[in-house]
Amino acid sequence: MNPITYELIKTDKQTGARLGRVHTPHGSFDTPTFMPVGTLATVKTMSPEDLQSMQANIILSNTYHLWLRPGEDIIREAGGLHKFMNWDGAILTDSGGFQVFSLSDMREIKEEGVHFRNHLNGEKLFLSPEKAMDIQNALGSDIMMAFDECPPYPAEYDYMKASVERTSRWAERCLQAHNRPHDQGLFGIVQGGEYEALRKQSAEDLVSLDFPGYAIGGLSVGEPKHVMNKVLEFTTPFLPSNKPRYLMGVGSPDALIDGAIRGVDMFDCVLPTRIARNGTCMTSNGRLVVRNAKYARDFNPIDEHCSCHVCKNYSRAYIRHLIKCNETFGFRLTTYHNLHFLLKLMEQVRTAIKEDRLGDFKESFFEQYGLNKANPKNF
């Protein structure tokens, strides 16, 4: 029995977006969904109870960072990541590939894996498909990611073709090295940049290996929005309709809606938590930079249309004061609000799919959020 299964509930008649449910060893979650990122086994400033209160049923943790600190052996000794961090929902771990490949001046790619230097102390390290599986098996996440090559954007066709072929070979090695297929599902990652033929080749290679789910990688790496949307449009049809599809590293409201319309089920990004620590909040009318001086005497909530406990109890003036004074509680409030906002947005997306009106929802949301043509960057 596969530990990860996908149930397609319905498709939206306006857009073709999918309403579904993913079942894991640590519970089920409805899709499309957004996954908060807990890089170091914590979503910064949030407790597990905070995340449960906003109906976050799956979170993401980072293999590379947990390998370096505290080390996978300590987490294995603790009984796995769920026990270590007291989280009883589902956990997805990335493979560490993105972090290693982002150390472009500190790494060397070979067929066996990647040689690179620890960003903390300069120590020489080596990460391979086998090592990435070993670490993730020790962490015990519900969903593991294959170790892939993450090419830069833009990249020449020939470079990208060689990269796709290596990613396919590494995916096979990941499957062979995966020691816990009975209780951890391993997803393959489709690469290929903006080249349709290479996306097709990558998807077909991975689908032939019969992973329980598929990620679309190599997007949200600096390409324009229209390129991301175009790539999704020609990539998702190559993926099986009875398995979940995960768009990696995407978390702006417009990209979540556009991704869902193009058949994506799962998203993750540090965006809502990172901008929260800069005093930037997502609201139904676009971004609000609460640290700005104009909010010093503004006793309204961050978003009057928001039902989260932050908006019910705290004013912009108070939150601005906390952030200006570098008080952790201020970052906690903005983080809670932003995550609640995105999780609520995905709930609205699911309701719109259920009612066959996601196209209409997108139009009204984009207009109110300031994503019309006059102000396309307000995300």
UniProtKB/Swiss-Prot annotation:
Q: What name appears for this protein in its UniProt entry?
A: Queuine tRNA-ribosyltransferase
Covalent S-S links between cysteines:
none
Q: Which cofactor does it need?
A: Zn(2+)
Q: What family does this belong to?
A: Belongs to the queuine tRNA-ribosyltransferase family.
Q: Which residues span the membrane?
A: none
Give EC number(s), comma-separated. Answer: 2.4.2.29
- Positions with a binding annotation for substrate: 94-98, 148, 191, 218
- What is the scientific name of the source organism? Oceanobacillus iheyensis (strain DSM 14371 / CIP 107618 / JCM 11309 / KCTC 3954 / HTE831)
**Which amino acids does the record list as binding Zn(2+)?**
306, 308, 311, 337
Which reaction is catalysed here? Answer: 7-aminomethyl-7-carbaguanine + guanosine(34) in tRNA = 7-aminomethyl-7-carbaguanosine(34) in tRNA + guanine
Free-text cofactor note:
Binds 1 zinc ion per subunit.
